[in-house]
Swiss-Prot record:
Gene this protein is translated from: ZBTB22
Gene Ontology process terms (BP): regulation of transcription by RNA polymerase II
Record's function text: May be involved in transcriptional regulation.
Keywords on record: DNA-binding, Metal-binding, Nucleus, Phosphoprotein, Repeat, Transcription, Transcription regulation, Zinc, Zinc-finger
Coiled-coil portions: none
Polar residues biased stretches: 199-209
Entry protein name: Zinc finger and BTB domain-containing protein 22
Record GO terms (molecular function): DNA binding; DNA-binding transcription factor activity, RNA polymerase II-specific; RNA polymerase II cis-regulatory region sequence-specific DNA binding; sequence-specific double-stranded DNA binding; zinc ion binding
Listed Gene3D superfamilies: Classic Zinc Finger, Potassium Channel Kv1.1, Chain A
Highest taxon of the lineage: Eukaryota
Length: 634
């Protein structure tokens, strides 16, 4: 190896590149990771500066007349809504709903570049709306959390004010230890809380349809208020219940004050009902709209399959959450309480008696082993069960014939009744007069009510469960109504499901048959067939006496009777010859007495032999209108 050359000063000079030793190779498995954490924020900050200066912006957003420019790449990465608009649809100008506040949207747009969001407490709902429309869920979650915290602080403030500075009506001494507060203070606090609750709940909020949080709010405020005003006078039953007479510190009753607090807490309740004063019960405050008689819905505690009365309010507060999903609904008709022997009515005055009939209870949540069956809005009579008693009942199989199968003793049959279009049950009562006549030989007398004829809308629809008998006649060949097992909500019964479905279409005003020429719609197929004759111009019915043609069969029948009568009385008439085309005369079975005013024998004797023709189908003329013309006799 040659020594490196020396400089005039004696220092070694660097070797040329070609003479430098090669660098040591790095191991093949070695990977060098270098991180630049400030690049991300610097990149977004640079993009935000370009947005503010209007540089390289390729999309515009309009909100209530204001236009904002931005980068489509940033919008697509920050919002699923913008991702669909700019990538899937390729839009360069986007108009947002007018429900959004332009100022709130401008702040949210800036947060997509900076990651920071500043908002006033009064504008949280506006930002929640913007986040919901743009599907920016991190903003929705944060606004929801802020609203929940604000509501909790407002609840604490109202509870403290109600417990310390409330004036009892009629007493001159304030109930709290503080100064005297006017009674309007409570009303203003209540209205303030109501307005805050209504403002903080927007349709786009994630907890807008969350009744549980509203329940927690109402329960906590009621419990705190009751603890401060009454002490230990609180009873829980799906929610706190205040006793009506409560004596304040000054000796005067504060019942009015407690009722006002109950109204305040009911505004955010779960909608299950209001508290009945003095009874400790809840009564429903909402009934679903329906064209049928309204029913009262009362939540009761699950009592298994036992028909004995059950308490209306859960007694154990620790089991309230478990029993909340095991509710039953008691349905009571107002105008049918006298007719139902086992019907019940919830006492408003707080009486201990509340007679509950198992036939009036419909299950909302079935046991896990039973499940909920698919219920048709028009149920057949084989779904009916007995109203009273628990003996085995035979049903009808799918083919319509009776089968000797019976219900299991552990699961008595549930009384399923016909439903109207809104899902309300139509009550069907057994006929007491026909129960004794339709009883089969050897049948116990106690089951007459469940095997008798069922009165539906004034018609008798035979026996519903006696093997081998329909309508009380052995052998299953009784009256014609015995085989009509398909019921409509209006009370009519049909022997075939297709007939019932066609009848239901009449109720629903469905017109499935369209005319291909004029687009008119018809409910029945034969109506369309008759209507098509008006487009073809065919007149298939021709009088055999005067050779006059008719389009409609009923018009032809009326004319034929009058024409034949005139021909018999006058003895003159144009009788068609052998070459005259004749239309279809009616069959012999339709030439019954009443046509022409006389009997059938007189008509045959008076009519000339040449005018009595054998019935033949009408002639068919083809018309080029896109469909085959025709339309013979029905």
């Amino acid at each position: 190896m040659e020594p490196s050359p020396l400089s005039p000063s004696g220092a070694a000079l660097p070797l040329p590149l070609s003479l430098a030793p090669p660098p040591l190779p790095l191991p093949a498995a070695a990977v060098v990771h270098v991180s630049f954490p400030e690049v991300t924020s610097a990149l977004l900050e640079s993009l935000n500066q370009q947005r503010l200066q209007g540089q390289l912006c390729d999309v515009s957003i309009r909100v209530q007349g204001r236009e904002f420019r931005a980068h489509r790449a940033v919008l697509a990465a920050s919002s699923p809504y913008f991702h669909d608009q700019v990538l899937l649809k390729g839009m360069t100008s986007i108009s947002l709903p007018s429900v959004m506040d332009p100022g709130a949207f401008e702040t949210v747009l800036a947060s997509a570049y900076t990651g920071r969001l500043s908002m006033a407490a009064a504008d949280i709902v506006n930002f929640l709306t913007v986040g919901s429309v743009l599907q920016m869920w991190h903003i929705v979650d944060k606004c929801t959390e802020l609203l929940r915290e604000g509501r909790a602080s407002a609840t604490t403030t109202i509870t403290t004010a109600a417990a310390t500075s409330v004036t009892v009506p009629g007493a001159g001494v304030p109930s709290g230890s503080g100064g005297t507060v006017a009674p309007a203070t409570m009303g203003s606090a209540r209205s303030h809380a109501s307005s805050r609750a209504s403002e903080n709940q927007s349709p786009s909020s994630s907890n807008y349809f969350s009744p549980r949080e509203s329940t927690d709010f109402s329960s906590s405020s009621q419990e705190a208020f009751a603890a401060s005003a009454v002490g230990s006078g609180e009873r829980r039953g799906g929610g706190p219940v205040f006793p009506a007479p409560v004596v304040g510190s000054g000796g005067a009753t504060s019942g009015k004050l407690l009722l006002e607090a109950d109204e305040l807490c009911d505004d955010g309740g779960d909608g299950r009902g209001a508290v009945v004063p003095g009874a400790g019960l809840r009564r429903p405050t909402y009934t679903p709209p329906s064209i049928m008689p309204q029913k009262h819905w009362v939540y009761v505690k699950r009592g298994g399959n036992c028909p004995a009365p059950t308490p209306l309010v859960p007694q154990d507060p620790d089991l309230e959450e478990e029993e909340e999903e095991e509710d039953l609904v008691l349905t009571c008709e107002d105008d049918e309480d006298e007719e139902l022997g086992g019907s019940s009515r919830v006492p408003v005055g707080g009486g201990p008696e509340a007679t509950l009939s198992i036939s009036d209870v419909r299950t909302l949540s079935e046991p896990p082993d039973k499940g909920e069956e698919q219920v048709n809005f028009c149920e057949s009579s084989n779904d009916f069960g007995p109203y009273e008693g628990g003996g085995p009942v035979a049903g009808l199989d799918d083919s319509g014939g009776p089968t000797p199968s019976s219900y299991a003793p552990s699961h008595p049959p549930r009384p399923l009744l016909p439903l109207d279009m809104q899902g309300n049950q139509i009550l069907v009562f057994p006929s007491s007069s026909s129960s004794s006549s339709s009883q089969a030989p050897g049948q116990p007398p106690g089951n007459q009510a469940e095997h008798g004829a069922v009165t539906v809308g004034g018609t008798s629809v035979g026996s519903l469960g006696v093997p081998g008998s329909v309508g009380g006649v052995p052998g299953g060949t009784g009256s014609g109504d015995g085989n009509k097992i398909f019921l409509c909500h209006c009370g009519k019964a049909f022997s075939h499901k297709s007939m019932r479905d066609r009848h239901v279409n009449m109720h629903l005003n469905l017109r499935p048959f369209d005319c291909p020429v004029c687009n008119k719609k018809f409910k029945m197929k034969h109506h369309l067939t008759e209507h098509m004759k008006t487009h073809t111009g065919l007149k298939p019915y021709e009088c055999g006496v005067c050779a006059k043609k008719f389009m409609w069969r009923d018009s032809f029948m009326r004319h034929r009777g009058h024409c034949e009568r005139r021909h018999r009385l006058g003895g003159v008439g144009a009788v068609p010859g052998p070459g005259t085309p004749t239309g279809p005369s009616l069959p012999s079975k339709r030439e019954s007495p009443g046509v022409g005013g006389g009997s059938g024998d007189e008509a045959s004797a008076a009519t000339p032999p040449s005018s009595r023709r054998v019935w033949s189908p009408p002639r068919v003329h083809k018309v080029e209108m896109g469909f085959g013309g025709g339309g013979g006799a029905n």
